[in-house]
Amino acid sequence: MDRRAFLLSAAACSAVSASTAQLALAQSTQRFATAASYSAQRDGASFLVVRHGVVLAEHYSAGGADTRWAIGMGTRAFMPLLAASLVEDRLMTLDEPVAATLGDWGADPIKSTISIRVLLSGASGLSFEANGPRDLATAIALQPHQAPGTEFSDDSAPYVLFSEIARRKLTTANREPDPARYLTSRTLLPIGCVPIGWTRTSDGLPRFDDGAAVSARGWAQAGELIRRQGVWRAQQIASADALGEAMRGSFAESRAGFGLWLSGRGRARDNFAIETDLWRTSSPAPIDLAMAAGQGGQRLYLAPADGLVIVRQARSLTSAAWSDAQFLSLIWRDL
């Protein structure tokens, strides 16, 4: 082949490659256009679909890739990452009693039986009074309303307590004592989940139950680490066992993990703060789907078997009604 023929052939191949890439991008955008439109029409701000770490679709109705949005109770997805980081650093185990850290509980015959695992699962029996104070002192003094391990309660008390447990363990180990700063510098920064903003209680503790602000890409990276059970770039940076437990239900509630809602059938009536149709019989959610859910339709969906992480953020925590079942049906239709 002479030089001219070679150059013409190379140019043709380059043109084909470029047009193939453009076609693939166009098809990907078109594939999820209906889901993106559904989100945007309901005050959506961001929409992101990631499969096996590869972005399949990304759309912003407001802001951009680095814009942080308040995710409300979707913040709870960071609690299992905090727990898994502490376990990986050998600062705690899931089966140790809470009383090993909160010493005042040791003398209580019921509270002394509550393990970290039971606390994180929401089955400790501890919950704040509806119109009462929600500070640390109140949380520590709470008495279980039910026998630990028997009933689930969708309440912020376990998050307040676990933040204090983390603070005490980090202080004892001479590590960064602030749980949010520890998690951010140790785990979130390496995976690209920054910048992230935290709200705090009147005691100064970071709130892991509500109030974080993060970008769509950052939240997706956190979800990807959970989906991969703590492995990042071939390194185990957070405990696989702890993150595996975070995506399993308990005897008390099969639809609740550690800060995550799980697809499946419950054995009791719904008594949850979050509004969702995820568990309707018509829902297309796969059996292994996990979801972090904030007010206003702030959502992080994880589907491990499909390798999927999906983020949907709204402009406010009071946005229009949101249907998980309808949104997921649009996603799965286009996969």
Enumerate the language-model features and the residues they cover.
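Active-site SXXK
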Residues: G53, W69-D95, L119, F162-A166, ...
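Active-site Gly/Thr loop motif
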Residues: V194-G197, R248-V309
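Active-site helix/loop module of the DD-peptidase/beta-lactamase fold
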Residues: E88-S124, T171-D210
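Active-site-proximal alpha-helical segments within enzyme catalytic domains
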Residues: P158-A166, D210-W232, Q298-Q313
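N-terminal secretory signal peptides and thylakoid transit peptides that target proteins
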Residues: M1-S14
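C-terminal segment of N-terminal export signals and the immediately downstream linker at the start
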Residues: M1, A18-T34, R42
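A short, well-structured edge-of-sheet supersecondary motif
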Residues: A35-G64, L300-A303, G307-R312
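Short, charged, amphipathic alpha-helices and their helix-cap/turn boundaries
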Residues: V54-E58, L120-P158, E176-G197
